[in-house]
Amino acid sequence: IFFYEERNFQGRCYECSSECSDLSSYFNRCNSIRVESGNWILYEQPSYRGHQYYLWKGEYPDFQRWMGFNDYIKSCRFIPHPHSQYKMRIYERGDFQGQMMEFFDDCPNTYDRFRFRDIHSCNVSDGHWMFYEEPNYKGRQYYLRPGEYRRFSDWGASSARIGSFRRVHHMV
């Protein structure tokens, strides 16, 4: 992945080939990105915090193309090749309480399938997933690896509102 300080792949450039918890020393701002291979999660703050952005192979000439809110990218993580199976349980309350539903595929509208607008906890058994704040894969994004998420803050969200989610596939 190549990070550029200016739009349209101009200005200072930094090449990264693995995850990095703090990109601050390599560039001050990020206005364009070229992904040569693989899938990546970019974070607005160091140590994999803040707004998250999911990018795959392609060119992103300005931060709006990756649904960015500004030109801050301070950490990044490479997503390993996906598993052939996906499985996730979502819960209406924290600590895996309340109504539960199990999913194996994408969901463009959580309310239509779950009857709740909020997801307070989640258990990812297989695969990697992206949560989106709004239906139809819009709004803030949250990356989930296999593991237990007892509360929405565990996946980096400031509220439990999740409008849609999908499996992370390697995009080409």
Curated annotation (Swiss-Prot):
Residues 1-37, 38-80, 86-126, 127-169 form the Beta/gamma crystallin 'Greek key' domain. The gene is cryg4. Gene3D superfamilies: Crystallins. It comes from Xenopus laevis (African clawed frog). Monomer. The keyword Secreted does not apply. One of its GO terms (biological process) is lens development in camera-type eye. SUPFAM superfamilies: gamma-Crystallin-like (SSF49695). This is Gamma-crystallin-4. Pfam families: Crystall. Keywords: Eye lens protein, Repeat. Crystallins are the dominant structural components of the vertebrate eye lens. GO terms for molecular function: structural constituent of eye lens. Has a two-domain beta-structure, folded into four very similar Greek key motifs. Belongs to the beta/gamma-crystallin family. The keyword Repeat applies. It comes from the Eukaryota.
